[in-house]
Amino acid sequence: MKLSTRPHRGVTRSRILATFAAAGCAAAVLTAAGPAAAGTAAVRTGAAAATAAAATARATAVNGRIAFSQWDLLPGGNLAGPSNVYTINPNGTGRRQLTHVGKKHAAGAPDWSRDGTKIVYESNQTGNYRIWVMNADGSGQRRLTNDPGFMDLQPAWSPDGRHIVFSRCTTQPGGTGCDLEVMTARGTGMRRLADDHWSWVHAEYSPDGRQIVVAADRGGFLSALWLMRSNGTGLHRITKPSFEAFWPEWSPDGSRILFTDNCCQGGSNVWTVRPDGTGLRKLTHFSMPLQDGFASYSPDGRQIVMQFNGKCPARGICKYLYVMNADGSGLHPLRTGVPFTFLSDWGRASS
């Protein structure tokens, strides 16, 4: 069963969440063994040598905490509120809850600022989904957007910390998709980079701030990665729609783009590609019912944190965080102590 990534008329959060949080697949199809079995699953590694990202990442980068979303589950694997933003050390210790939005609300999709001092995220704690920002310890939580008739989702920082790019999806009758918007870090100066003729989801600035990569869906179930200048010009596609690529993220040195292919075609997997669309490389090799994705590089480019789907006793389907080397080797679980964790972002240690 596939769910469209495109929010059509009368957009609902549950429809968008089906792609963002559930990797575009009904959770009921997942009957894989839990994390213990996943750690020993037959996973063919990528190239033996480290990827270009790991080989050339700046030596000054220091890996900090991993931010992630946590959802509660109902029996059978159905999503239920609340969800909140947490952080954890790369070795699985020191889990810390940053948001407390209440039983009927949600906060998630965290993205670290480049200096490791702030996190931008989405939340519906005051009604519809808006963009929020907070300090790395969870203090200073502040709403940045509040326009009626829209859901604001999937925020990401510019490298200099001055701007935030995000998806704005209409909830009005007749709405056709999601705009791509950018604003200042204070929530002012909003302008549109791409209109809602398509659905633009999860954009990311390049490390030098000159380009933006974004997943776009032009109806049906087809999604591809597109590249544009940071001012919205020069739009061009870098992956084939047949990949149904989503959730892109740049390597710290800008040489590769990490992404996930869509599930239900034999399992979802993590790939990388060069910004010019060449050098496509598959890092994981799962087959249904195993799935992984929604991956993020460590600040030094040597590792990747990602979501892995598995079965948990008496709870239905669970999603765990796993870490692997940048070449796809060394896959191992990150023991978060919670059964449903996803949409992670690996931050840099603040100075």
Residue ranges and their predicted role:
Residues 2-42, 47-49:
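Secretory targeting and sorting signals
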Residues 2-3, 39-351:
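Sequence signature of WD/YWTD-type beta-propeller architectures
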